[in-house]
Curated annotation (Swiss-Prot):
Protein localization: Cell inner membrane
NCBIfam families on file: NhaA, PRK09560.1, PRK09561.1
Protein name: Na(+)/H(+) antiporter NhaA
GO BP: regulation of pH
Catalytic activity: Na(+)(in) + 2 H(+)(out) = Na(+)(out) + 2 H(+)(in)
Family, similarity comment: Belongs to the NhaA Na(+)/H(+) (TC 2.A.33) antiporter family.
Gene Ontology molecular functions: sodium:proton antiporter activity
Length: 399
């Protein structure tokens, strides 16, 4: 189990660096003579037609609805594993990150709504600063190497997973519109099919893939966001087979490199390009970007710390061994790295006539996320013990 966690953490670390490169490239293209080509590329129409079934979307929608469904499937697999066998499998293990995650969603949303009070259009973005980007946050933490205790990494990982689960619930409840009953019925039948496969002990992934594709198409057509299909599929895939193997973990390990090195960087490149040329200084200080940036930079750490403190004081949660509040505080700041998850919610919150707010939202996400990353990194570096270079070198020679 420890080896699996280490492999996961190191892979997410490398992914964080790749995400930074993708964001930088998107910003350069969006603010250069290549901006027209960049936007035109994202607006390219792509159509899939099989008989009477017709799916016609722009490239950016294929990325957000299709590729991100695979990412959310990975989230579902991680959540299921941690709930059944991992860091969230007991009340004692799950209590502190659960308190922290809830506070880390409530406070940022409250700060955003405070800045956007009275405007029903911009209020739709209340959930944008409530998300944490697990890849980016772990990537920043990994820059400190062996100085970071495993308990601190597991705390951040568990918190981010619960946060992701909260985001899934938020999307299902608040960002699904114009529902199609026929498509929902087809989706319901597909879900029953997936549950049936699980109950019958089917461990081959092929049947889940076929029924899962039907579910994704039905959910896409239903008005509920298509990424939720990925989570449902993940929850239906068996964690353990009779021979002790794990179909769920096998798929999780297969999806990880695709998600880390392809899906998330593509998503970041497609969604992070903000054209700054038409913006004035007043636009930068408007309620949407300020509410998001402060929600991430102040709301996230405050929520994580306050709710964690309440949980500990009520004796409903305990700090992991070797961890103190001086460690929790900078990690709470790193939870303000919303980035890809926040951008994803932004793409759902500001659509149609409100789409113009999307650039403001992305700007707030970038400012809040990068500020949280920088301050969190230097704060954590200050409170962690220095590595004994001579000792580490000696260890390497012995190995």
């Amino acid at each position: 189990m420890e080896r699996a966690i280490k492999n996961f953490l190191s892979q997410e670390s490398a992914g964080g660096i790749l995400l930074m490169i993708a964001v930088a490239l998107a910003m350069i293209m969006a603010n250069s003579p290549l901006s027209g080509m960049y936007q035109g590329f994202l607006d390219t129409e792509m159509q899939v037609r099989v008989g009477s079934l017709d799916i016609d979307k722009t490239l950016i929608h294929w990325i957000n609805d299709g590729l991100m469904a695979l990412f959310f499937m990975l989230i579902g697999l991680e959540v299921k594993r941690e709930l059944l066998e991992g860091a969230l499998s007991s009340a004692a293990q799950a209590s502190l990150p659960t308190f922290a995650a809830v506070g880390g969603m409530v406070f940022p949303a409250g700060i955003y709504l405070l800045f956007n009070y009275g405007d029903p259009v911009t209020q739709a973005g209340w959930a944008i600063p409530a998300a944490t980007d697990i890849a980016f946050a772990l990537g920043v933490m990994a820059l400190l190497g062996s100085r970071v205790p495993v308990s601190l990494k597991v705390f951040l990982l568990a918190l981010a997973i619960i946060d992701d689960l909260g985001v899934v619930v938020i999307i299902a409840m608040f960002y699904s519109t114009d529902l199609s009953m026929l498509s929902l019925i087809v989706a319901g039948i597909a879900i029953l099919g997936l549950v049936g496969l699980n109950r019958k002990g089917v461990t081959a992934l092929g049947p889940y893939g076929v029924v899962g594709l039907i579910l994704w198409i039905a959910v896409l057509k239903s008005g509920v966001h298509a990424t939720l299909a990925g989570v449902i599929i993940a929850f239906c895939i068996p964690l353990r087979a009779k021979d002790g193997s794990s179909p769920s973990e096998s798929l999780e390990h297969s999806l990880h490199p695709w998600s880390t090195f392809i899906i998330l960087p593509i998503f970041a490149f497609a969604n992070a390009g903000v054209d700054l040329s038409p913006m004035s200084f007043g636009d930068l200080l408007s309620p949407v970007p300020v509410g998001i940036a402060l929600g991430l930079l102040l709301g996230k750490p405050l929520g994580v710390l306050v709710f964690s403190y309440i949980g500990v004081k009520l004796k409903m949660a305990v700090l992991p061994e070797g961890m103190g509040w001086k460690h929790i505080a900078p990690v709470a700041l790193m939870c303000g790295i919303g980035f890809t998850m926040s951008m994803f919610i932004s793409s759902l919150a500001f659509v149609g006539d409100a789409e113009a707010y999307g650039d403001f939202a992305r700007l707030g996400i970038l400012v809040g996320s990068f500020a949280s990353a920088i301050i969190g990194y230097f704060w954590l570096a200050k409170v962690l013990p220095e590595v004994d270079v001579a000792k580490e070198s000696k260890k390497g020679e012995i190995a």
